[in-house]
Structures are given as C-alpha cells and as structure tokens.
Regions:
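Nucleotide-activated donor-binding/catalytic signature segment of Leloir-type glycosyltransferases, i.e.
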Residues: 261, 268-295
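N-terminal subdomain of nucleotide-sugar transferases
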Residues: 1-60
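Conserved donor-binding/catalytic core segment of Leloir-type glycosyltransferases
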Residues: 219-236, 241-246, 259
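A short, well-ordered alpha-helix in the C-terminal region of glycosyltransferases
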Residues: 126, 360, 367, 374-389
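Carbohydrate-associated surface elements
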Residues: 39, 180, 199-202
Length: 406
C-alpha cells in the first residue's frame, strides 16, 4: 500500500517555492500527497488570473492534490497587511484541516517559511489523528520576523518568542538546513539529536542548465554582470549593493551592472535608494520572472549575488538562492554571516563578505572583476561540483522521505 503524506504550507504552486517540487518528488517516489496551502499572492499580494476566494480551491499539480484555505492577501506589503497575512492563513487553515480528519496519512509534513504560525494547522491534525509531524525549518522565528518588521516592544517580542518556540516544541521531528541551525533547534526545544535532522535544501534540476539568451547577452555585452535573483525584502538587505556601487563610482569603475531579477516589499525602497545615491547607471531592475527562466539570468551573469540582513540567527540558515546559484555554475558573491558564506568558502565557489559590509563587498567585486576569466570559471565549476555532491535533488529527496516516514 502506498504511503500518504499531508503537506501543510502557506505557500505552494503557482508561487515560486521549493515545496512544489518536493511534493512532486514525493509523488515520483510512489507516495500519495495532499497539500493544504493558501491563496497564491506572494510576493506582491496580487492573486494570479484564475484565482479567487472561491475559485480553484481544489486543484491537481503533477499528481499532487492541492487544497486551498483562505488568507488575507498581503497587498501593498505594508506592515499591517503582512501581519494580517501571517495570522490569517493559520487561522483559516486550522478550520479547513478539520475536513481532512476523515483521511488517513502516514505523516504530516510542514514546510515552514514565514510565518512560524503556519505550523499550527499541522499540529491540529497531528494531535487529533495521532500522526507524526515533521517540520522543515526554513525561516527561524522569531528572528526572521525581526528582520522584516521592526518590533521593539519588549512584551510583543517575548510573546512572539514564546509562541514561536511553542510551535517548534509541538512537532515530533524537525529538519534544519545546517548544523548550526540544528544545534539551535535542539537547544530551544529540548529534543534529542535523533529527532532533529540536518538536510540542506536542494534546487530543481532546471537550475543545472546553461541557457543563453542572445538578446540579453547583446544588451549587457559591455558590462561585468552581477545578478541578484529572488525576493526583495528587508531580510535580503539588497541595499548593500547600492552602497558598494557608490564606492565603485567613486573609484571610476563604470562597466559593472547589477541586474536585479525579482520583486518584493522592499523593491520600491531599493529603487528610491539607488536614485538617492546617484548610482542608477549601475542597476537594472527587471521585475519578477518565471522561476524556470532563472537559468537564463544565471548563465548571463559573471557573478551571482547573495546578501542577507545582519543577524546572528539568520546566519544559521543557508538562503535558497545560494543553493540555486551553486547549481548555476557561476562564482557567488555573498554578503552573509554564518552558514551561507561558509558553504561558499568550503566549496571554493566565490568570495564572501560579512552581512551589511559594503566595503568588503566592493573589494570582492573589484577582485572578481579584475581576476582572469579562467579563475572565475574555476570558481563556477567548484560551485556546480559541490551542488552535485551535496545538494542534488535525488539525494536530498530520499533523505527527506526517509526521515519523515521513519
């Protein structure tokens, strides 16, 4: 008899989150999968065509049965709308999950990005049906929240901390992306080491392709191209690139271009900061693109850029874009504390700088820009080699399945 897994995740296809491919991978491994997710509206708070409060509430995606709960859209990406979005999905999904009580699953799997409260409906089903719950911790709370919303009130901070830890403790098993995050989860939950696994993120196989676009290559042929691809929010701290560009301008280096592919709550702020600093000639904002187009921009790049806001606990995680970048086979420029930079150093796949250190980033850009092309190509080859050895889809999927169903 086939094993059955219920996945709880606020975000799912058609939003660009890796859980969609993980669910597909489970099906490929002869597992029946149901998903309880929200209404697609990330990152700009706008529903794609064909979706609504009562439209497409049940779908099929690559053999995965998808069920959608209500949530308040994050339209406008104001602090209030994000807060309402964060609390509305777990609220509505906790009622929606009751309709699943007549179904039998071997495991519940929560893919926890922000907010941590999306774990709650998974806890509800797990406890009522006595089915083990495994949560993949992609965003550590409350630390990730503080990188997005500036919460200074001590009472609120303590409340968020206690409720976040409560959710982690109620899971039967946890998955961390890195050894450092593993240690932190063991410490805050009191769980045994056997109940907390370290499994890195993988990226979809299409990231491993080199796809040339003649039009883009012609457009940027006279530039050293640094590509940032992904969400643009306070947690990413993309503005560090603006400060580095100002140093490049003062140094008289004019043929470097930051190509920003993506959208998010901070995009307008970053564009305004670029204008304020007078470095518009160093930036092109291309907006959001289909995730399957990312190999085009990775192939275009001379270097791929991965920043993260300064935070001791954010440094415990490896951003998903770092994994995707390494598969792309290009040198990676990080501006990250902790694990995200450590993996690049270990793989000899690029140059690293501390979070928020625009001077160090500027120096690394100049170093990479000035080095022979063969040395950059060697870094890119190292990145792709490390990807196939440690982050391949087949290996990570099997590790996930074994741990969840054990």
């Amino acid at each position: 008899m086939k094993k059955r897994i219920l996945i709880i995740s606020q975000h799912f296809w058609p939003e660009n989150f890796r859980i969609s491919d993980i669910a597909t991978g489970f099906v490929e491994n002869d597992i029946e999968v149901d998903v309880l997710c929200g209404i697609p509206n990330y990152p700009n708070g706008i529903m794609p065509e064909g979706y609504g409060w009562f439209k497409n509430k049940k779908q099929d995606f690559n053999g995965v049965k998808v069920y959608r709960s209500w949530e308040i859209l994050r339209k406008g990406n104001t602090s209030l709308r994000i807060f309402l979005n964060y609390i509305s999905y777990p609220f509505f999904a906790s009622f929606k999950v009751l309709s699943f009580l007549g179904k039998k699953y071997d495991a519940v799997f929560c893919y926890e990005t922000s907010p941590v409260y999306m774990i709650f409906p998974a806890i509800v089903y797990s406890k009522l049906k006595r089915v083990p719950l495994t949560t993949y911790v992609l965003d550590l709370w409350p630390e990730n929240l503080y990188s997005v919303l500036n919460i200074q009130n001590k009472f609120l901070r303590n409340l968020v901390k206690s409720t976040s830890h409560w959710h982690y403790k109620r899971c039967d098993k946890l998955i961390a992306m890195s050894p450092s995050l593993n240690d932190t989860l063991v410490r805050i939950t009191g769980k045994s080491k056997e109940k907390v696994a370290t499994i890195p993120q993988y990226c979809e196989k299409f990231y491993e392709q080199d796809i040339h676009n003649a039009q883009l290559e012609e457009k940027y042929k006279d530039y050293f191209k640094i590509v940032y691809a992904g969400n643009i929010s306070p947690a990413q701290n993309v503005e560090v690139a603006v400060d580095a560009a100002l140093l490049l301008k003062k140094d008289g280096i004019k043929d470097i271009k930051f190509i920003i592919v993506g959208d998010g709550m901070s995009k307008k702020d970053i564009e305004a900061y670029v204008e304020k600093q007078g470095v518009g000639e160093y930036f092109d904002f291309l907006g959001s693109k289909p995730v399957t187009d990312m190999p085009v921009y990775h192939t275009l790049a001379d270097a791929l850029f991965a920043p993260l806001a300064k935070s001791d606990d954010l440094g415990l995680t490896i951003p998903a874009k770092v994994t995707s970048y390494m598969a792309g086979g290009k040198p990676v420029l990080t501006c990250i504390d902790g694990e995200g930079s450590f993996v690049i150093e270990k793989a000899k796949a690029g140059l690293t700088a501390p979070s928020g250190d625009s001077k160090a980033l500027y120096e690394n850009i100049v170093k990479l820009y000035s080095m022979p092309k063969t040395e950059r190509e060697e870094m890119g080859a190292n990145a792709r080699k490390y990807h196939f050895e440690y982050h391949s889809r087949d290996k990570v999927l099997q590790d996930l399945i074994n741990f969840i169903l054990d």
